[in-house]
């Protein structure tokens, strides 16, 4: 069968691989148009660039300004992809648009447009040729273009390029774990020291490295362990390599077995690493060549060689139709709106550019601009609308609101400014305060400038208004506030009219001075009452005590310590009745040995009262308390009973009327006055205290301790609960500071054992549950008490 068939001879393909152009009958319409465009391009390449008739020397391509250049490049890109029909459509649709005059051959920018069009067409053909080569087919039109390029460049194309297998992208090989490159300039001794140290660090860990660096800190041979040293990187690389050797990965043995069985894998790894190194070197060399080429091109540019193409004159009336400039708020608002739109609206991709022509792009841009303006107008209207009025009920003034809102346990003192800062705002306060180390100086300088100004600041205005509101409740307040302010003012006025009390400071040396002050003050008070005969207060005798306040315990004067005598005048040995008038200059107090023999006759029907008791004193007269007492700062020391003012010396009072009985003596008489003053305060005998361990065993568990507040005579106490009596006095002061806002270092606690030290426990001083401690303030710079 095969022998009867005729075998026709076929021509062998040419050696250059080019089969020649296809006949016109086999071409499609698109290929025909492309062939025509190719012919026009070849003609344009052969023809010299169009010259523009000017008055100066002949010039080549004129580059348009940036805005027109963008339109030219976009148009050339679309025309190179879609053909000349697209260019004709653009000319028809934008006939009256001056921006598209570059499409006319008489325009000076037409040469630049033709240049860009040729450039984009060449790029498209290069891409199409690469695609055809990968598919194994050849386009005769592209072959013609390639031949032209080869003729222009006098280079022979590579015919075997289409038959080569495309190279795969190289992947980075595994990092070299066991290879460390030696740095330049290292000596043999330094290398040995670094290697030995790296071996010990890899074996013993980071603790060995830390200890060695601390011990050999001043040794220059071990400075390579410092991160700032040039050999530190080499040292750490050695440590990592030795660590990999001492602790290899689990799959290392399996890899070694495979490599020993098949040496081809080892050779492939070596070749792969070689190719990778070559590619890295080539890439590095290419980058260097590009930088050098760019530098040479920049150096070849003559920056002083330019030609004035056209000069534009701006008339003064051209800016009349322009909108007024935007304010800063409008610019910020528009930038925020555009940023939000960029986040919400997806940027149109390059796929849309293929389907939209220049006119459609313009319409879309104008629509977007109009939408932005409408949104900006809406935003301005929203901002211009006033917020609705809000009515607040149960409103309180800021000064009344502060005590309820401020919690002393959640406020700390700033170490920089000394202000009270909430705990939750302390970190931000410290961050702001530490931004500038001269913050305090700048703040003081700013306040100094503020003081020099004549205008008050906002804070001062607010304070002035608050003060005015307090002084004028008839304007800013209610009737109740006005009445309460009037009552307070009357009370303060009465307090100012009352004479100041003479207070004994508790020292033995100041007893006489304090007594003389009290005598002179009471003498001035009696001068006003001597003329009133019917006043019962003008008669000698015990004065009526003021009624005690409800809820306040009666405080009786304490007797002075033994052997303590006031510097008072001694009475002469003469007897007088307690209620009878006395001669001037004669005191009522008598020696003890004479008063035991006196009796007081009374009216008929009344029993005689014996005078064998200690000398009586007026209830209104208070004996100075012992040193350290809690009443030392609050008691008054008037003149003793029977002492007359100096102004009344030499005058005699009339005898009492017959039938009048002297007032009865007080129910309780104070003890006799001491004879000799005490030189030193007596100390509390600590041996009388129960030992601390025994006291803790008797009083286990938490306890409540009562502490009297300073400068308060209404008998108020605050109760402090401690978890155990083993707590020291300092912790108790901290709890007190949280209650009354007095720093612990300003507090002074005293009890039955005297003043309490901060480092001692409560059980040491036998302070139990329910015991009352006296709180006073520690004074700086005063005399030691």
UniProtKB/Swiss-Prot annotation:
InterPro entries (alphabetical): SF3A1 (IPR045146), SF3A1_dom (IPR022030), SF3As1_ubi (IPR035563), Surp (IPR000061), SWAP/Surp_sf (IPR035967), Ubiquitin-like_dom (IPR000626), Ubiquitin-like_domsf (IPR029071)
Domain of life according to the entry: Eukaryota
MF-aspect GO terms: RNA binding
Modified residues (N-acetylmethionine): 1
Bias kind Pro residues: ranges: 543-554, 653-674
Nucleus listed as a keyword: yes
Region spans: Disordered: 1-42, 124-175, 522-554, 639-713
Protein name: Probable splicing factor 3A subunit 1
Organism: Arabidopsis thaliana (Mouse-ear cress)
């Amino acid at each position: 069968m095969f022998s009867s068939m005729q075998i026709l001879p076929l021509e062998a393909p040419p050696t250059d691989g080019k089969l020649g152009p296809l006949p016109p009958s086999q071409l499609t319409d698109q290929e025909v148009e492309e062939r025509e465009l190719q012919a026009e391009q070849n003609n344009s390449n052969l023809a010299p660039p169009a010259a523009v008739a000017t008055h100066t020397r002949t010039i080549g391509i004129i580059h348009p300004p940036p805005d027109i250049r963008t339109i030219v490049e976009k148009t050339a890109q679309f025309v190179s992809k879609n053909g000349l029909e697209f260019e004709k459509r653009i000319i028809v649709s934008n006939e009256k648009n001056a921006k598209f005059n570059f499409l006319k051959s008489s325009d000076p920018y037409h040469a630049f447009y033709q240049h860009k069009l040729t450039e984009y067409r060449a790029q498209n053909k290069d891409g199409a040729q690469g695609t055809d080569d990968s598919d194994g087919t050849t386009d005769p039109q592209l072959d013609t273009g390639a031949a032209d390029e080869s003729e222009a460049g006098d280079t022979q194309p590579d015919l075997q390029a289409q038959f080569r297998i495309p190279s795969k992208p190289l992947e980075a090989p595994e990092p070299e774990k066991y290879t460390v490159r030696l740095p330049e300039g290292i000596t043999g001794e330094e290398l040995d020291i670094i290697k030995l140290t790296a071996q010990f660090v890899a074996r013993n860990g980071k603790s060995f490295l830390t200890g060695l660096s601390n011990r050999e800190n001043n040794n220059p041979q071990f400075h390579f362990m410092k991160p700032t040293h040039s050999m530190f990187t080499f040292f750490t690389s050695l440590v990592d390599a030795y660590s990999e050797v001492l602790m290899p990965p689990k799959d290392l043995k399996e890899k070694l077995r495979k490599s020993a069985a098949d040496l081809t894998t080892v050779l492939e790894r070596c070749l792969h690493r070689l190719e990778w190194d070559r590619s890295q070197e080539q890439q590095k060399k290419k980058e260097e060549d590009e930088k050098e080429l760019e530098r040479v091109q920049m150096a070849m540019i003559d920056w002083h060689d330019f030609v004035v193409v056209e000069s534009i004159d701006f008339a003064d009336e051209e800016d009349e139709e322009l909108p007024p400039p935007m304010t800063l708020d409008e610019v910020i608002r528009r930038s925020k709106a555009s940023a939000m739109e960029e986040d919400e609206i997806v940027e149109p991709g390059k796929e849309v550019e293929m389907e939209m022509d220049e006119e459609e792009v313009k319409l879309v841009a104008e629509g977007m601009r109009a939408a932005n303006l409408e949104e900006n107008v809406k935003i301005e209207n929203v901002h211009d609308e006033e917020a609705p009025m809000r009515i607040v009920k149960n409103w309180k003034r800021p000064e009344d609101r502060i005590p309820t809102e401020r919690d002393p346990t959640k406020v700390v003192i700033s170490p920089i400014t000394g202000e009270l800062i909430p705990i939750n705002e302390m970190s931000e306060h410290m961050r702001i305060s530490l931004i500038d180390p001269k913050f305090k100086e700048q703040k003081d300088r700013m306040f100094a400038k503020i003081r020099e100004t004549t205008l008050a600041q906002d804070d001062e205005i607010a304070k002035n208004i608050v003060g005015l509101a307090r002084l004028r409740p008839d304007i800013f307040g209610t009737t109740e506030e006005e009445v309460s302010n009037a009552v307070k003012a009357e009370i303060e006025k009465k307090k100012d009219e009352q004479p100041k009390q003479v207070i004994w400071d508790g020292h033995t040396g100041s007893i006489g001075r304090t007594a003389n002050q009290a005598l002179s003050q009471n003498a001035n008070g009696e001068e006003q009452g001597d003329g009133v005969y019917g006043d019962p207060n003008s008669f000698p005798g015990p004065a009526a005590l003021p009624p005690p306040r409800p809820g306040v315990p009666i405080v009786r004067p304490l007797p002075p310590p033994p052997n303590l005598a006031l510097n008072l005048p001694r009475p002469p040995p003469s007897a007088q009745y307690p209620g009878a008038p006395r001669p001037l200059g004669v005191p009522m107090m008598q020696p003890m040995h004479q008063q035991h023999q006196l009796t007081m006759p009374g009216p008929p029907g009344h029993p005689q009262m014996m005078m064998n008791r200690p000398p009586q004193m007026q209830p209104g007269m208070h004996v100075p308390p012992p040193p350290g007492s809690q009443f030392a700062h609050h008691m008054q020391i008037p003149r003793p009973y029977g002492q007359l003012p100096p102004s009344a010396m030499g005058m005699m009072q009339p005898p009492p009327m017959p039938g009048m009985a002297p007032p009865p003596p007080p129910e309780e008489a104070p003890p006799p006055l001491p004879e000799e003053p005490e030189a030193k305060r007596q100390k509390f005998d600590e041996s009388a205290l129960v030992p601390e361990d025994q006291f803790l065993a008797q009083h286990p568990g938490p306890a409540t301790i009562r502490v009297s507040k300073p400068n308060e005579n209404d008998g108020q106490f605050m109760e402090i609960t401690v978890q155990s009596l083993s707590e020291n006095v300092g912790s108790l002061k901290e709890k007190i500071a949280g209650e009354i806002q007095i720093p612990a270092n300003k507090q002074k606690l005293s009890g039955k054992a005297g003043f309490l030290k901060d480092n001692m426990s409560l059980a040491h001083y036998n302070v139990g549950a329910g015991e009352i401690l006296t709180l006073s303030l520690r004074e700086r710079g005063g005399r030691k008490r």
